[in-house]
Amino acid sequence: MSTFKLLKTLTSRRQVLKTGLAALTLSGMSHAVAKEETLKTSNGHSKPKTKKTGSKRLVMLDPGHGGIDTGAIGRNGSQEKHVVLAIAKNVRAILRNHGIDARLTRTGDTFIPLYDRVEIAHKHGADLFMSIHADGFTNPKAAGASVFALSNRGASSAMAKYLSERENRADEVAGKKATDRDHLLQQVLFDLVQTDTIKNSLTLGSHILKKIKPIHKLHSRTTEQAAFVVLKSPSIPSVLVETSFITNPEEERLLGTTAFRQKIATAIANGIISYFHWFDNQKAHTKKR
């Protein structure tokens, strides 16, 4: 029986906390490395394989929406789910060219529940998780890119609150309701390490924004925060990138061009690479102390 299956059977939060601490200490939160063809998760949790020391860094890219969930739709009919999948595939290609193992939560037009997207990242032992979207808003004049990290203290702005509530309703499109089933351990471990994880997520967001700024308008110059379900990973730095507002006619046009999708993908990938360089420098500096 896997650690996660065992912990799910415990009824006391205190028992889960104690066992989770032991698992965290003994395993160092080891994650799985699996083939990309088996990315989709089911309700059954397969036993994870231990990630080998010295293995490539792994970035899990999550193209938002998919299948029955189209995401936002532009005035001319562009669907968010298709645009962000194309961008995510471009980011994957760029990262792989830089020696980084990049994978997608979905490679086609399929629906994946929000919590499953988080679990996919953990099962593959991801070092980073990035959900890629294209904003939809009631005001067609809203424009620019934004980056969001998780918040456990409320949204950092009215826009952040609006977008997180909208994205968190994605499962309802497929008749599913987000529940806490099978996620008690995840919540407990999140409570244990959330401070460092959110801090690193905010840093990752700042690196991405710096790379996007020269090539595209920013809707927000700092990493926003809100309670996005898809960012609720206990130990993996996670951000949600809203590449543009697909409900803005001009930005819908841009998102429909191969050139812009490649340009924004390059900026995102360079932001990830920049973050890894920063992280390595921080780690080296800490060791010297």
Curated annotation (Swiss-Prot):
Any one GO molecular-function label of the UniProt entry: N-acetylmuramoyl-L-alanine amidase activity
PTM (free text): Predicted to be exported by the Tat system. The position of the signal peptide cleavage has not been experimentally proven.
Pfam family membership, one: Amidase_3
Primary localisation category: periplasm
Reactions that this protein is recorded to catalyse: Hydrolyzes the link between N-acetylmuramoyl residues and L-amino acid residues in certain cell-wall glycopeptides
Residue ranges, annotated region (Disordered): 36-61
Domain MurNAc-LAA positions: 59-273
Keywords: Cell wall biogenesis/degradation, Hydrolase, Periplasm, Signal
InterPro entries: MurNAc-LAA_cat, N-acetylmuramoyl_amidase_3
Bias kind Basic residues: ranges: 46-55
One record GO biological process: cell wall organization
Subcellular location: Periplasm
UniProt keyword annotation of Phosphoprotein present: no
The enzyme's E.C. designation: 3.5.1.28
Cellular component, GO annotation: outer membrane-bounded periplasmic space
Domain of life: Bacteria
Signal peptide positions (record): 1-34
Function per UniProt: Cell-wall hydrolase involved in septum cleavage during cell division.
Membership in a protein family: Belongs to the N-acetylmuramoyl-L-alanine amidase 3 family.
Protein name (Swiss-Prot/TrEMBL): N-acetylmuramoyl-L-alanine amidase AmiA
